[in-house]
Amino acid sequence: MGKRWDSNSSGSWDHIWSGNDTQHPWYSDINITYMNYYLHQPHVTAVFISSYFLIFFLCMVGNTVVCFVVIRNRYMHTVTNFFIFNLAISDLLVGIFCMPITLLDNIIAGWPFGSSMCKISGLVQGISVAASVFTLVAIAVDRFRCVVYPFKPKLTVKTAFVMIVIIWGLAITIMTPSAIMLHVQEEKYYRVRLSSHNKTSTVYWCREDWPNQEMRRIYTTVLFATIYLAPLSLIVIMYARIGASLFKTSAHSTGKQRLEQWHVSKKKQKVIKMLLTVALLFILSWLPLWTLMMLSDYADLSPNKLRVINIYVYPFAHWLAFCNSSVNPIIYGFFNENFRSGFQDAFQFCQKKVKPQEAYGLRAKRNLDINTSGLLVHEPASQNPSGENLGCRKSADNPTQESLMEETGEATNSTET
């Protein structure tokens, strides 16, 4: 795996292992430095395994359920849900390829697999992370168009598929240079102690081998800009515009609308808080890892600082970043009332007989679409012959307020069944 998504390969080990303190997992000789196969004491290793298993379990279960619910329920085959489905797929890849390999890299010395696995795993890890981030941006764009510009046509299913193809194509393009530069290298001055019988083995690392440090820095900067800085800026700007648009919806209400203002105000607060949660989670989960990667390439750190960063700080930063893939199904799915109804339908959790009024309500809910941050939007019941949605709006009087009610999962007074 490359230096981008794991810790042992994140820096030059020529400057990390030094000293002859036998309390640490390395021992120095005149020309050779020996290190233990396991990098940590058993209790530290147990903490690493437990914490990574927790997010792995949440990631696999949560995102698998999201995929199952979207596939099983035909009424959930909508534009926003396809984006959420794509997000779940990319997050599943993060769980399958990033979490176990990174955990292994955090607790043992060296790369235990071959050269082909080095390139493949590094490429898939980078692609899955990039695709997950780009899909978050696509979801934000979809919600931004619907709430801020409610009179404009919604994205069609065809357009959504094109965007998904572009997302994966862009992710592959961005991460290909990393896969090309990934190589398994033998450490000439380091060996691994396999047992107490003084048996040793050659150490191999899977890491990017750039011609010079300047090229590595340029590529790291490009990744930082395209996978973190630009997506973060777009998400924050669009969600801020959505929040501002929702905040202004009831400024000029009269008559019957005044009776609804208190309820609408509560809905606004709920939506705005959820938007802030999405943005903050994205910022906080990825910022430490990107900070470390930029420091590794640009800062002139001492050997002791490099050792501490690679052995202790990087594992936590990766764990925090991977948490984003574990909480995404909760934020974009299970906080959504309509999604929970779809979950119950898919797994046949509803045991009691549904009353006629409740059946009507369930049919109405099935015209709702999962939205970002647990928000909902009605999918228009009528479409033109080409399959294009006629628009996000439901009311010409106050389309943004109507979008607000729909965004929060409240059924409007529609007569469609």
From Swiss-Prot:
Keyword Transmembrane: yes
Topological domains annotated Extracellular: 1-45, 104-119, 182-217, 296-310
Molecular function per GO: G protein-coupled receptor activity; neuropeptide receptor activity; opioid receptor binding
Biological process according to GO: cellular response to hormone stimulus; G protein-coupled receptor signaling pathway; neuropeptide signaling pathway; regulation of MAPK cascade
Single GO cellular component term: plasma membrane
Cytoplasmic side: 67-82, 141-160, 239-274, 332-417
Location within or outside the cell: Cell membrane
Cysteine disulfide links: 118-206
Residues carrying sugar: 8, 20, 31, 198
Assigned keywords, A-Z: Cell membrane, Disulfide bond, G-protein coupled receptor, Glycoprotein, Membrane, Receptor, Transducer, Transmembrane, Transmembrane helix
Domain of life from the UniProt record: Eukaryota
Keyword Glycoprotein: yes
Membrane topology type: Multi-pass membrane protein
Broad class of where this protein is predominantly found: membrane
UniProt-annotated stretches for the region Disordered: 378-417
Pfam family, one: 7tm_1
Transmembrane segments: 46-66, 83-103, 120-140, 161-181, 218-238, 275-295, 311-331
PANTHER family recorded: NEUROPEPTIDE FF RECEPTOR 2, NEUROPEPTIDE RECEPTOR-RELATED G-PROTEIN COUPLED RECEPTOR
Family: Belongs to the G-protein coupled receptor 1 family.
Function: Receptor for NPAF (A-18-F-amide) and NPFF (F-8-F-amide) neuropeptides, also known as morphine-modulating peptides. Can also be activated by a variety of naturally occurring or synthetic FMRF-amide like ligands. This receptor mediates its action by association with G proteins that activate a phosphatidylinositol-calcium second messenger system.
Record-given protein name: Neuropeptide FF receptor 2
Organism per entry: Rattus norvegicus
Gene: Npffr2
